[in-house]
Amino acid sequence: MAEIVDVRAREVLDSRGNPTVEADVVLKSGVVGSACAPSGASTGSREALELRDKDPARYMGKGVLKAVDAVNTSIRSALIGRDAREQRELDRIMIDLDGTENKANLGANAILAVSLAAAKAAAQEKGVPLYAHIADINGTSGQYSMPVPMMNILNGGEHADNNVDIQEFMVQPVGVASFREALRVGAEIFHNLKKVLHDKGLNTAVGDEGGFAPNLPSNEAALAAIEEAVTKAGYKLGSDVTLALDCASSEFYKDGQYNLSGEGKVFSSEEFADYLGDLSQRYPIVSIEDGMDESDWDGWAALTRKLGDKVQLVGDDLFVTNTKILKQGIDKGIANSILIKFNQIGSLSETLDAIKMAKDAGFTAVISHRSGETEDTTIADLAVATSAGQIKTGSLCRSDRVAKYNRLLRIEEELAGSAPYRGLKEIKGQE
């Protein structure tokens, strides 16, 4: 038994300088597992609750001492003496202790930090890498693959202070045989994009996730800049590298319309679906995330009808890693992929349940960071353990993003060929 003898938490800072929860789970053997909860900027309204203190005298109300206290008192008392290897049991205890649908009492940030810390402690106790332990929990031991990275190299929306409406413009190096090579391709494109923007007299400052955030006249201008960077890096757009968008449409949806203020355009749901379809015909865009507002299910149905057989349509704010909402989407034929952010649901077990439900329905699952990250690299292990096939963890700068890429490099080296990199085959509609 990997007996838990202590559970403790502290307030630490995330990559945006805001407080978040770090938890330690201590075992009788002396092993300590530590993990941090991430935090989002553009958030779905149905996400599990991130408990903040709302004390304006500390961190402008964003302190997390209440969540830390929940870990140090009620969660600690409930978990001491339990077996850290029994992940689902630990998560169930914390969920029951909270007693709400959205983890509003203890906070999803408190529960998740402990959930992940327990998994790390159990992995250390077993003497196995974290991905191997997560695969054991998930029933996917030995079925590993390396994920295709969606590299967010140009930012707009809530992730940047500019006039570009679409939140993320991403490259996916699909025409290579390993994650290591994919990372190299992405880095070379990133550096070439910086030069392209600089030569046009544009800002090369970066946003929350490490992507560039210049003022551009349109979303298409962002795609054209990336196309130029891909070419300058010596790669071919469409075969070596494909494109992905995160529209984060809920951020510009108002009164039943999509308002692209940067371009001075307003669209109905059908018109915006056509707009995205037009972009994906003119550029090799193979994945579109949150192409419609989270509440616009008719719009999602239209988008899926128009593009669902050839473009991966990822629900983030739409599904918020929640199996109940995902099941509704599956039943109604809406979207064909889910973004997985474990702080949207608040525990490792529930995250694994969402991935399994998606895969069983023929959906893909894209493992994702948040805009407020830490040095914690658990999502890298999660992607490999579940053979998810795709990961979103930002651009090719900022240590909070690069840490995940470097963890994946080490995992690929460790697995020595037993975790294939499948490229385009991992993306829905491109199999």
Curated annotation (Swiss-Prot):
Pathway noted in the entry: Carbohydrate degradation; glycolysis; pyruvate from D-glyceraldehyde 3-phosphate: step 4/5
Cofactor binding mode and count: Binds a second Mg(2+) ion via substrate during catalysis.
Co-factor(s): Mg(2+)
Subcellular localization(s) per the UniProt record: Cytoplasm; Secreted; Cell surface
Annotated binding of (2R)-2-phosphoglycerate, by residue: 167, 341, 370-371, 392
Self-association state and partner proteins as the record states: Component of the RNA degradosome, a multiprotein complex involved in RNA processing and mRNA degradation.
Catalytic residues, chain numbering: 209 (proton donor), 341 (proton acceptor)
Family annotation (PROSITE patterns): ENOLASE
Role played: Catalyzes the reversible conversion of 2-phosphoglycerate (2-PG) into phosphoenolpyruvate (PEP). It is essential for the degradation of carbohydrates via glycolysis.
SMART domains: Enolase_C (SM01192), Enolase_N (SM01193)
Alphabetical keyword list: Cytoplasm, Glycolysis, Lyase, Magnesium, Metal-binding, Secreted
The protein, known as: Enolase
Family in the record: Belongs to the enolase family.
Catalysed conversion reaction: (2R)-2-phosphoglycerate = phosphoenolpyruvate + H2O
Biological processes per GO annotation: glycolytic process
Catalytic activity, EC: 4.2.1.11
Record keyword Secreted present: yes
